[in-house]
Amino acid sequence: MQPLAHIVDLTANPIGDPAFRAQCKTTLDTAGALVLPGFLTAAALATIRLEGAEHSHAAFYAASKHNVYLRPQDETLPADHARNRLVVSSKGCITDEEIPPQSPLRTLYDAQPFRDFLCAVLEEQCLYPYADRLSSINLHYAHRGQELGWHFDNSSFAITLLIQKPQAGGRFEYVENLRDADRGEMNYAGVSQVLDGERAVKPLAMEEGDLVLFRGRNAMHRVTPTEGDITRMLVVLAYNAQPDIALSESARMTFYGRV
């Protein structure tokens, strides 16, 4: 197993330093998003990109239509209501099972100093891997024309690493604090404005090797279609606040094509 210092640029990102952690937490709490530029070392980034290319043949590809809330359609409302309007998402994915045992991704995911940093910034007591064999580390591929449609997350946070930028497109866009899920305030009017292009959205600039923490439960967000021949590659590091949690079998079939 590689030392963490071979994977993370600890000079630029001193994840064990309390002041650095506090600064990161303040940024995330204020903006709902945190980008740490050059988080991965150049060597780790190159290795992960190569692993992604070598295992791309094992990716499960799926395209789906869904509403922004990622919920079943509400038959009591019109089809053109914000609650029911459909958007498209399409991508490929390899699962934790395809990530090599010696991958820098696995070392990073399992590293206690990294988890301690995440807990401090996200205000979580502990973070645990998924109990199933597929969900903890995923690498997503978006080829030309593939995109992630507008949606809200069901989870309170997302942790990602951009591994390969496309030639164009593949932009992450979001509107923060558009709903209040805990209070059941869905803000249908605001969602309609975003879907109709009548409301300003924020781009979240990220480069290859950057770590991104994002709170997407109340922030509507999307990734625009990939343009050009270079595939967008993004790693998702998924943790749970409780132990022994597995993604449901139905969700695994939807996301991975198997259980």
Where are these regions (language model features)?
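Non-heme Fe(II)-dependent double-stranded beta-helix
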Residues: 2-24, 29, 38-113
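Catalytic core of Fe(II)/2-oxoglutarate
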Residues: 174-177, 181-259
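Short beta-strand segments enriched in hydrophobic/aromatic residues
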Residues: 40, 163, 239-241
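Hydrophobic residues positioned within well-ordered beta-strands of beta-sheet architectures
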Residues: 36, 157-159, 233-235
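Aromatic-acidic/polar surface patches that form glycan- and anion
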Residues: 37, 41, 107-110, 152, ...
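Catalytic core of non-heme Fe(II) oxygenases with the double-stranded beta-helix
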Residues: 98-106, 115-211
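A generic secondary-structure signal for well-formed alpha-helical elements
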Residues: 56-60, 122-125, 243
